[in-house]
């Protein structure tokens, strides 16, 4: 813990408190993730993920790793860069004992690859859309600027709420375009 915090330049966390209290550790991990994601270099990411994943409470470590995945996905230049970055982390992620935690992180990576491919110009099919989580479908419904993607979500979204968000956003985008 001390090395992880020092490596991120965080010196105001009591290491003994962090070791003893999962809430203090979780907060410290969030800060480490922020520093790590804001760095231009990705060279230390695997070692940082490995250190976080040694936490005795997998839910705490999983949450921190997911936060890093989310931040890096929003920072990369495209799906190829994210695919390469995430592939370097998968051996560490696969060390998690709980299969549900491993699967959750793998699904999140898949979701972001899907999102980034759309941002890169790919128009997904209904079958591809069905393979991403409800969370990612909602992110797309709330953030996509593509009328074609919004129409797909309106027609094929997995939940009524997703379909309604997409339908309403597509309608308002059409009005603004007129």
Name each model feature, range by range.
Residues 1-178:
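Alpha-helical scaffold segments
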């Amino acid at each position: 813990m001390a090395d992880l915090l020092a490596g991120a330049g965080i010196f105001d966390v009591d290491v003994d408190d962090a070791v003893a209290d999962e809430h203090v550790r979780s907060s410290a991990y969030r800060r480490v993730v922020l520093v790590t994601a804001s760095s231009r270099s990705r060279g230390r990411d695997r070692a940082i993920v490995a250190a976080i994943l040694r936490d005795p409470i997998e839910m705490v470590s999983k949450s921190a790793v997911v936060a890093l995945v989310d931040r890096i996905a929003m920072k990369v230049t495209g799906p190829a860069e994210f695919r390469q970055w995430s592939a370097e982390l998968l051996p560490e992620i696969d060390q998690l004992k709980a299969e549900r935690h491993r699967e959750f992180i793998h699904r999140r990576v898949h979701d972001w690859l899907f999102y980034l491919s759309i941002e890169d110009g790919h128009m997904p099919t209904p079958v591809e859309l069905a393979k991403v989580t409800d969370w990612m479908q909602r992110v797309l419904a709330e953030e996509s600027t593509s009328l074609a993607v919004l129409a797909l979500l309106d027609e094929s979204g997995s939940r009524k709420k997703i379909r309604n968000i997409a339908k309403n956003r597509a309608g308002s985008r059409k009005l603004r375009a007129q």
